[in-house]
């Protein structure tokens, strides 16, 4: 199992945390049902490599300087939106014998025939919640859309049998649809139709005026 080294943080003051980030480390916290909440820090480069290698719900060992090793997964990551710097990481110690709920990303696979006919593929459910042991958590759930025509859709009930773990979501939740292409009106044609209608209306008004005008008596 992948190992990420960490050290305990004794000083949690704001200026110390900022200095820690400036030195290339990410502050975080280790917690779980059987471990006391412990402030920690990890090297930013090492964390990024580990996170990319194991994936969103991947398991790895967090090795503390004092010799303690914990089976963990990343529960939450806080990122600065301005510079994409990792601000804080939550490491959750998992019990390998206890099932838990986890959100797993949904990926679409294949080319929908309906899309080739001009239809629009709408990916509606980007994550699915599964309930399973930590070792059985899938990295992602792949949904095949190669048989979807215009007007077709796939819901959770359609993919449940193909997923080897328990899906928590309701059966009627829609994962993906293929809808007919949107027809946009030609603004020039619309303007021309409006102009024609106005001309006809104006002509009608003139004719009405002529009918109302009294004729000349000889």
From Swiss-Prot:
Region described as Disordered: spans on this chain: 178-218
The protein's name in its UniProt record: Large ribosomal subunit protein bL25
Gene: rplY
Assembly mode: Part of the 50S ribosomal subunit; part of the 5S rRNA/L5/L18/L25 subcomplex. Contacts the 5S rRNA. Binds to the 5S rRNA independently of L5 and L18.
GO MF terms, alphabetically ordered: 5S rRNA binding; structural constituent of ribosome
Organism: Shouchella clausii (strain KSM-K16)
Bias (Basic and acidic residues) ranges: 203-218
Keywords in alphabetical order: Ribonucleoprotein, Ribosomal protein, RNA-binding, rRNA-binding
GO terms under cellular component: cytosolic large ribosomal subunit
Function: This is one of the proteins that binds to the 5S RNA in the ribosome where it forms part of the central protuberance.
Gene Ontology BP terms: translation
Family: Belongs to the bacterial ribosomal protein bL25 family. CTC subfamily.
């Amino acid at each position: 199992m992948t190992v990420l080294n960490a050290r305990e943080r004794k000083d949690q003051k704001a200026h110390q945390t900022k200095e820690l980030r400036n030195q290339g480390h990410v502050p975080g916290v280790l917690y779980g049902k059987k471990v006391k909440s412990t402030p920690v820090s990890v090297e930013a480069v090492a964390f990024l490599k580990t996170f990319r290698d194991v994936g969103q719900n991947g398991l790895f060992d967090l090795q503390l300087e004092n010799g303690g090793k914990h089976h963990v997964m990343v529960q939450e990551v806080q990122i600065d939106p301005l510079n994409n710097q990792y601000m804080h990481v939550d490491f959750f110690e998992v019990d390998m014998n206890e099932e838990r709920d986890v959100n797993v990303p949904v990926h679409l696979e294949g080319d929908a025939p309906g899309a080739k006919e001009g239809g629009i593929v709408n990916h509606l459910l980007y994550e699915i919640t599964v309930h399973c042991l930590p070792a059985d958590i899938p990295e992602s759930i792949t949904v095949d859309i190669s048989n979807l025509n215009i007007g077709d859709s796939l819901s959770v009930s359609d993919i449940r049998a193909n997923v080897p773990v328990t899906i928590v979501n309701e059966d009627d939740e829609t994962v993906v649809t293929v809808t007919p292409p949107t027809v946009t009106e030609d603004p020039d044609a619309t303007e021309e139709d409006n102009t024609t209608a106005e001309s006809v209306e104006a002509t009608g008004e003139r004719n009405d005026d002529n009918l109302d005008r009294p004729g000349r008596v000889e």
